[in-house]
Regions:
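N-terminal regulatory/effector-sensing and dimerization cores
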Residues: 1-74, 99, 103
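Amphipathic, well-ordered alpha-helical segments in soluble domains
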Residues: 6-9, 61, 85-89, 110, ...
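Short, Lys/Arg-enriched, Trp-marked, Pro/Gly-tolerant hinge/linker segments that flank
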Residues: 73-84, 96-107, 116-165
Length: 169
C-alpha cells in the first residue's frame, strides 16, 4: 500500500482505473489521483495503450493542495487542460535530480508551480470556486498590514490593497 499521493496525467491513449469498487475508462486529458492507503488498480488499454506522466508527493498540506486542484478520495479523476505546462514542471523536477539543497528547492518550486497551474485550471472548470477564500481572516489582515507598512508613504487605493491580498472582484 502506498504512503504518498501519486497524481497521473494521461498524455495519450486509453486505460482503466478501478478504485473504491468503481471502474473508470480514461483517455488523454484525464488525470487521476491515488491517495495514501487507498487500494487501486490500473492498466493500459491493449489496443491503444496510454502514455502518462505522474508526480508523487506527500506533506502536511498534500491533501489540501490536491483538493484545491479538484482531486479528493471521492472524486479521484478529472479532466485537465494544462498538460503541456504540467509536463514542463515534471521535466524540471526530473532535471533537478541531484541530492543538493539547490536542486531540492528547484524540485519543490516546480511542484508548487505544478499545483498552482492545476488549481488555476480547476477554477476554469468550476468557476464557483474562484471567489472562494480558503485562508482564515487573520491571514488576510496580516497581508493587508504588511502591504500598508511597505506602502504607507504612497497613496494607497483600496482596490490595490484588495488585489494584493487576493480578495478583489
Amino acid at each position: 500500500m502506498r504512503t504518498t499521493y501519486v497524481l497521473h496525467i494521461i498524455r495519450s491513449g486509453r486505460g482503466t482505473l478501478e478504485i473504491h469498487n468503481q471502474k473508470y475508462e480514461l483517455t488523454a486529458g484525464d488525470a487521476f489521483l491515488l491517495c495514501p492507503d487507498v487500494e487501486a488498480w490500473y492498466e493500459a488499454d491493449w489496443e491503444d495503450p496510454w502514455s502518462y506522466m505522474w508526480v508523487g508527493f506527500t506533506g502536511y498540506r498534500a491533501q489540501e493542495y490536491a483538493g484545491h486542484a479538484g482531486f479528493t478520495k471521492r472524486t479521484p479523476i478529472r479532466k485537465v487542460n494544462c498538460g503541456k505546462e504540467l509536463n514542463s514542471y515534471i521535466d524540471g523536477i526530473l532535471e533537478a535530480h541531484q541530492l543538493s539543497y539547490t536542486d531540492e528547492l528547484k524540485r519543490n518550486g516546480y511542484l508548487m508551480l505544478f499545483f498552482a497551474t492545476l488549481m488555476e485550471d480547476y477554477k476554469k472548470i468550476v468557476p464557483a470556486i474562484v471567489n472562494q477564500h480558503s485562508y482564515p481572516g487573520s491571514v488576510y489582515v496580516k497581508h493587508a498590514m504588511d502591504y500598508i507598512a511597505h506602502h504607507y508613504r504612497e497613496k494607497i487605493k483600496i482596490s490595490e490593497l484588495a488585489d494584493y491580498i487576493g480578495v478583489n472582484r
